[in-house]
C-alpha cells in the first residue's frame, strides 16, 4: 500500500494507526499546488520511468504488439540513460548559427540583382566580366596598398622642406653652393607644369647636351616627385620624364621659390 502526502507535506497515517512514508511522484500534482518547472526532456524521462514501473506491476504482455511496445519503451529508456536525450528549448538558450556568406548574399537584394544580371548574359559576356575582375584584382596586388592615391596636400611629407630633402645629396650640395641660373630653373618648372597638368600619364622627352642643364632638370623632377632618366640617342643625350602618380599635383612652393627663401 502506498501512502500519500498530506497538506503539510508530512507522512499520512493509515486508519489502523500506522504511519507510512510518502513516495513523491506517484501521482501527478494537483493544479492548485506549486510545482517546480522542469524541462521537456526531464518530463519525458519521468513518464518513461513511470511507464516501465507500471509495466513491472502488471502481468507481462502476452500479445506480440504489446510486447513490442514494452521493448520499445525499455529501449528508449536505455538510450536516455546512456547517451542522454538532446537538449530541448527549455534546457538552455540555443544560439542561432551565424548565416554563411552564401545565405547573406541571397538575402541581399543588391547582390541578387547583380547575380541575376550576370546569369542572364551570354557566355562571352560572362567571360569578359570574369576576365576584367581578375585583371583588376591582379592590378591591385601589384600596386600594393595606397599606390596611386595622391595625398600630397594633407601629407606633411610633401612640405617644401621635405620635397627639397627628396633631392639627392649630390644635387642638393650643388644647388646650395653654386650660383643657380634661376631663369633656366624656372623655365624647366614651367615646361613640366604645363606638360603634366594636361597629360599626367604621358612621358616628357627633351634632347639636352648640356650636362649642367640636365642636372638642373633632374633636381626639378626630384623636387616635383617625378621620375627622370637620361640615355644616349644617336650621339646625343635624351631626357625622359614621367609621373609616378595617377594625377599630377605639384608642390605649393616650387624649387626656384624655395631656393630664394634660403
UniProtKB/Swiss-Prot annotation:
Any coiled-coil regions, as ranges: none
InterPro entries documented for this protein: R3H-assoc_dom, R3H_dom, R3H_dom_sf, R3HDM4
Keywords per UniProt: Nucleus
Signal peptide: none
Start and end residues of each stretch annotated as Disordered: 1-27, 132-155
GO molecular function, one term: nucleic acid binding
GO cellular component, one term: nucleus
Residues in R3H domain copies: 182-245
Record-given protein name: R3H domain-containing protein 4
Cell location: Nucleus
Lineage: Eukaryota, Metazoa, Chordata, Craniata, Vertebrata
Amino acid composition bias (Basic and acidic residues), ranges on this chain: 146-155
Amino acid at each position: 500500500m502506498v501512502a500519500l502526502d498530506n497538506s503539510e507535506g508530512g507522512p499520512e497515517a493509515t486508519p489502523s494507526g500506522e504511519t507510512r512514508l510518502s513516495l513523491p511522484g506517484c501521482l501527478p500534482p494537483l493544479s492548485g499546488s506549486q510545482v517546480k518547472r522542469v524541462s521537456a526532456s526531464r518530463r519525458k524521462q519521468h513518464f518513461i520511468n513511470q511507464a516501465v514501473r507500471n509495466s513491472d506491476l502488471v502481468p507481462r504482455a502476452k500479445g506480440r504488439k504489446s510486447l513490442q511496445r514494452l521493448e520499445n519503451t525499455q529501449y528508449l529508456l536505455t538510450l536516455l540513460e546512456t547517451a542522454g536525450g538532446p537538449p530541448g528549448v527549455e534546457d538552455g538558450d540555443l544560439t542561432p548559427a551565424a548565416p554563411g556568406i552564401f545565405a547573406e548574399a541571397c538575402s541581399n537584394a543588391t547582390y541578387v540583382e547583380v547575380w541575376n544580371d550576370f546569369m542572364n548574359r551570354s557566355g562571352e559576356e560572362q567571360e569578359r566580366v570574369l576576365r576584367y575582375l581578375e585583371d583588376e584584382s591582379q592590378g591591385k596586388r601589384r600596386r600594393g596598398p595606397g599606390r596611386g592615391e595622391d595625398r600630397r596636400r594633407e601629407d606633411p611629407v610633401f612640405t617644401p622642406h621635405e620635397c627639397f630633402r627628396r633631392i639627392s645629396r649630390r644635387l642638393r650640395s650643388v644647388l646650395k653652393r653654386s650660383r643657380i641660373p634661376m631663369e633656366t630653373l624656372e623655365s624647366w618648372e614651367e615646361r613640366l607644369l604645363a606638360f603634366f597638368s594636361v597629360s599626367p600619364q604621358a612621358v616628357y622627352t627633351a634632347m639636352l647636351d648640356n650636362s649642367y642643364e640636365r642636372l638642373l632638370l633632374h633636381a626639378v623632377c626630384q623636387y616635383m616627385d617625378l621620375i627622370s632618366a637620361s640615355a644616349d640617342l644617336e650621339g646625343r643625350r635624351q631626357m625622359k620624364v614621367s609621373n609616378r602618380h595617377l594625377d599630377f599635383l605639384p608642390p605649393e612652393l616650387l624649387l626656384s621659390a624655395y631656393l630664394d627663401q634660403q
